[in-house]
Regions:
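Short secondary-structure junctions and interdomain/linker hinges
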Residues: 143, 202-206
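Short, hydrophobic secondary-structure boundary micro-motifs
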Residues: 164, 206-208
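Beta/alpha (TIM)-barrel catalytic core signal, keyed to glycine-rich beta->alpha loops juxtaposed to Asp/Glu
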Residues: 5, 10-197
Length: 211
């Protein structure tokens, strides 16, 4: 269920998904960008009426967007066995380093309809992130990785991440991204600590539901 529908009761959504499973049309169902509060309600409804709850949530997760996966959802992993299928691991391409020296003419941000992304990149926060990307690129180079592999492996190192969605637009990009798995051993505790020292944005703890 892609994005919560505030006009539809969660019980109705859970029943609809359960019926699809009973009919054999789908095997499982999940959510995307739901809050911890909405997920908790979905599980409560499923348990109360003997229905099938969602088995996964699809949140945005990368080195610059960490709150949901690392804080808000933290109580849900053990409580419900929730898994996450995360999207935008490269932060819309920012973590590839291709925007470090400006916006390439053939990049996504240069396309019509992506003015919002350009504005975000050119904001003060965006400028700070680009400086962090440069430092991350230096670290990646020191351990023999391209920066986008570093960013992907960082996501994969989180035990609460079940699947990393690769937003590749070309077959060559997909093959290259998958090669990151050959370097999993390079994501050591020491490297993770160095990454934290660069981004300095680790969530402090579980957030309140809905925040």
């Amino acid at each position: 269920c892609h994005r919560p529908d505030i006009d539809t009761p969660i019980e109705e959504t859970v029943r609809a998904m359960h019926n699809l499973i009973v009919q054999g049309k789908v095997l499982y169902w999940g959510t995307s960008e739901w809050s911890a509060q909405q997920l908790t309600e979905a599980y409560a409804v499923a348990r109360a009426h003997d229905l099938t709850p969602p088995t996964m949530e699809q949140p945005e997760y990368n080195l610059f967007r960490r709150e949901k996966v690392e804080a808000e959802f933290l109580p849900l992993y053990d409580l419900f066995g929730l898994g996450t299928t995360i999207w935008s691991p490269l932060a819309s391409g920012i973590l590839t380093g291709k925007y470090n020296n400006g916006i390439p003419a053939d990049s996504r941000i240069a396309l019509p309809g992506y003015e919002w992304l350009k504005a975000r990149l050119e904001s003060e926060t965006g400028k700070q992130q680009l400086e962090q990307v440069k430092k991350l690129a230096k670290l990646a180079d020191e351990i023999g990785l391209p920066i986008h592999h570093l960013a992907l492996l960082w996501c994969n190192a989180n035990p609460h991440v079940s699947t990393v969605i690769l937003g590749a637009s070309k077959l060559s990009q997909l093959k290259d991204n998958l090669k990151a798995l050959d370097s999993k051993s390079k994501m050591t505790p020491e490297v993770l600590e160095k990454i934290e020292a660069i981004v300095q944005n680790k969530p402090e703890g579980p957030a309140r539901f809905g925040q």
